[in-house]
Structure formats: structure tokens, C-alpha cells
Amino acid sequence: MERQIKVLNIVPTPFFADRGCHMRILGEMQALSKYGYQNIICTYHNGRDLEGLDIRRIINIPWYKKLEAGPSWHKFYIDILLFFKAASIYIKEKPDIIYGHLHEGAFVGGLVKYLVSFGRVPLVFDVQGSLTSELGTFNWLKIKPIKWLFHNFEKFICKMPDFFICSSVSNGEIIKNRFHVKPEKVKVVIDGVHTDFFNRLPKMGFKSKLGIPEDAPLIIFTGALLAAKGIWNLVDAIPMVLSKNKNIHFLILGYPVEETEKRIKELGIGANVHMTGMVDYFDLPDYLLISDIAVEPKVDKAGEASGKVINYMGAGLPVVCFDSQNNRRFLEDGGIYAAENKIENLADKMLWAVENPNQAKILGEMNKKRVEEVFSWNKSIKDTVEAFQMLTQKKAR
């Protein structure tokens, strides 16, 4: 019997916490396991365990409970603990590949590669955005010396891996052009869906249970409720939509909810906006399948892919979004694109989708067909498998 290839996944985040990058990592793990890979996940102390995944956590840090995306000063010492945990797993398990997710994961993976394996084990970097660009969206880089420091840290990280798996075309371009990585070391592996994930019927009465009229047009947003993820673009667009059609309702899934709830209350739009807080990822289809239109209000600055768009497509929804390279890569002609990253254009396109339900439905059907043909994880993961095979064969020589 052929030996399973062991992959040590270093995940510098509270996995699993029902948010975008976690959904990508979960999708990858599930798809890789179908190709016979044994995945070990080394991650933070918080987050929840999932059946069927080998998740190993650092020691408990009782005062650190943050689950949402975004930087934190606590991560500096937590990532030191992550290194020691990853090193101990490496010594015990002798993995064939180290797969560092996000920049910190690649950095910790690089330390394990060079300090523990002495360069013997290949390191792959799962790139989900630019570190400096993303920190900029969280207003962490207002002081120039700090920006310079993080840019050079990102540059250093990009010298450590043997291969780069990028979550978007933009990420791939950043890695090749800004950090001068050879093109043959870079593959773009767009987020996928497991095509059976949405094979269920909408729950009867679920819309009413959420306080939404059964006949009301429903626009859904899922994801982190953070400025960097575009939530304020959506919230500020809602009054523009309601000024022209008061029958439209909005369903917002995600967390943290406090700032968004406060802003919705200030705008006086609470009667038409329904917030759920954190939702179990495995219940996500129930919410998408009662919706008519999905919205992605993020402006692409950090090169991040948008896993939510893939889920919207998998549920057969028309998608309103800004006109960016990443959104075009996902949706092609199936997107309802708002020009110039302007909030009023986003509002206009949401109204158009409500007022033209037949055309919007056709776009949703196009999206579902496209995701099944192009973005299923079974198809997307083949490039990752090819890279892993190349690296393990090279290591065996």
C-alpha cells in the first residue's frame, strides 16, 4: 500500500471560525484528502474543532478570544507559540510538505523548514493577499517607518517558500511583480466549492422565522463586518436603495456586529435589515437559498480573493459587486458590476437586480453553471496536487 503524503498545515488564525480564509483552508483540506493526502493542522488555541480533521492547537491563552479577521498585537507572541507547536509536530510526524497559510503561516513554516528540518522539507505558501496592503486597509500603516518595516518583512517571507499557491490573479501578479518571484514557482488556485454543498431545498418558513416577509425581495451579504471587507459601502448604500423601494430587505450574516448594528440604528433602516451574527458555515446554504440577490461590497486593494462570491455562485444567485479583476475572474459575464467603486453605483445595481428579476435569475443560473464547471474544489485543487507532487519528487531525488 502506498504511503500517504503528510502535509503540515500551519494556520495562524483561530481555525475554524466560519469566515472567508477558513472556508478556503477547509475546502483545500477536504479536496486534498480525496487525493490521499494526510493533513495535520497546526493552529491557535481558539476556534472550533471539525469532525474528520486532525487539528492540533497551541496552549490555551485565556485572555485572547478574538475570532474576527484583522491584526492584533497579541499575534506577535501567539505566533511564537505557534512556531514551537509546529516544530514539535514536525519532529513527531516528519511531514513531507509544510503548507503555510497566510503570511504568518509561511513565516512560521519557513522557520520550521530552515531551523528544524535544515531545509530538507519543501515549504508551500498559501497566499491570500498582500500583507502590507491588507494591514493598510486596517489602518495599521499610517506611520511610514512601520510601513517600510512590514513591506520588508513581507519581502523576506517571500524568499522562504519553494512554491506559491495564490488565491487570486491579483495575488499572483503581486507575488511575481512586486516581490520578483519566478513565474514557474507560482500557481493561481481560485477558491472552490464542493458542488454538493448547495444540493438542498430552501427551508420552508425559514424566511418568516428570520422576520422577513415571504414576498419581499431579499439581498444577502455574508462575511466579516469590517471596513476592509466593504461593510460600510453596503450599509451606506442601503438607504439609497430603500429611498426608491421600501419593500427590499437585507440579510447580513457575519461578525463582529456591534459597530454595524450601531450604524444601522443611526440610519434608521433597522426594519429592513436583519443581522444574524456568526452563522455556522455548514448552515450557510439555508440562508443563501432563501435570498434573491447577493452583494460583495469590497473594493479590491489587497489582492484578496473573495470566497463569498464563490458561495454566492454555488447557490445560483446573481451577484452585485464592484468591477475588479478578481470579481471578473470569478463571474465573467455573470456579474452585475458597479462602476468606479462608487457606493451610489452599488445601490443602483442592487435596485436594477430587484427590478429585473428574470434577467437577474438568468445571471444566477449562469453563475451556478460556471462554478460547477470551473470552480469546483475537485477541479481547482489539481494545480495544488501537481505542485505538491513536483516538490515531493524533487525531495526524493
Which residue ranges define each predicted feature?
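Membrane-proximal helix-turn-helix segments that form the acceptor-binding/catalytic region
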Residues: 27, 84-91, 107, 114-118, ...
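Conserved donor-binding/catalytic core segment of Leloir-type glycosyltransferases
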Residues: 8, 165, 213-229, 235-238, ...
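A short helix/loop element that forms part of the nucleotide-sugar donor recognition site in Leloir-type
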Residues: 199-212
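Carbohydrate-associated surface elements
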Residues: 170, 192
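N-terminal subdomain of nucleotide-sugar transferases
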Residues: 1-49
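Conserved acidic donor-binding segment of nucleotide-sugar-dependent glycosyltransferases
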Residues: 335-344, 352-358
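Acidic donor-binding loop of glycosyltransferase active sites
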Residues: 288-304, 317
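Nucleotide-activated donor-binding/catalytic signature segment of Leloir-type glycosyltransferases, i.e.
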Residues: 260-285
